[in-house]
């Protein structure tokens, strides 16, 4: 998973991030390039990630941009639920880690383990490989909070979950 610092101050202000070629481009163009390359992306964010008045569309947009996970210090309650409903896994930093303390630049590769047997509020290991090859091992709290949310994620979101269950019943 390639780190895309969509939640960084620069990107919020300027709406630009690094694309797969390392060059600065719009968030949309970078997201499409990563999707075309088959590379899932991660957003790193701060405290109360997702707070605001258009939370449902924020989660939909995140999913449509090909983002598979959001790693933040904390989540706004409804937005966290909306991310899960869209099939995007929310994770929270643990042990005082955050995007600033880890000195993230957007050139990192992220690998999150333990997702094949996910359970509510499970702590999972995450390996952040910096551009220079340095590896930072951190733990994340998976903010899938309930058993039904695990099922939503396993199906790719609540809509896929409902449609598959309707198809089974038919």
Where are these regions (language model features)?
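Glycine-rich phosphate/pyrophosphate-binding loops
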Residues: 58, 65-97, 163-168
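Extended hydrophobic packing segments that form well-structured cores
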Residues: 141-148, 155-167
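Extracellular/luminal Protease-associated
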Residues: 32, 36-76
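Flexible loop/turn segments at secondary-structure boundaries
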Residues: 49-57, 77-81, 99-100, 135, ...
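Acidic, glycine-rich flexible loop/linker segments
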Residues: 80-152
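Single conserved hydrophobic/aromatic residue that forms the stacking wall/gate
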Residues: 1-7, 12
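Glycine-rich oxoanion-binding loops at beta->alpha junctions
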Residues: 13-34
């Amino acid at each position: 998973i390639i780190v895309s610092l969509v939640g960084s101050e620069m990107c919020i202000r300027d709406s630009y991030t690094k694309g797969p070629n390392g060059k600065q481009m719009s968030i949309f163009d970078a997201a499409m390039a990563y999707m075309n390359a088959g590379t899932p992306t991660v957003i790193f964010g701060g405290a109360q990630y997702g707070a605001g008045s258009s939370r449902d569309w924020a989660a939909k947009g995140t999913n449509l941009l090909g983002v598979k996970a959001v790693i933040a210090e904390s989540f706004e309650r409804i937005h966290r639920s909306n991310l899960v409903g869209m099939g995007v896994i929310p994770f929270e930093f643990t042990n005082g880690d955050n995007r600033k303390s880890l000195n993230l630049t957007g050139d990192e590769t992220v690998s999150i383990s333990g997702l094949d047997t996910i359970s509510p509020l499970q702590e999972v290991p995450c390996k952040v490989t910096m551009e220079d090859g340095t590896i930072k091992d951190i733990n994340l709290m998976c903010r899938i909070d309930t058993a039904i949310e695990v099922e939503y994620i396993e199906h790719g979101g609540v809509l896929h979950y409902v449609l598959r269950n309707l198809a089974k019943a038919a």
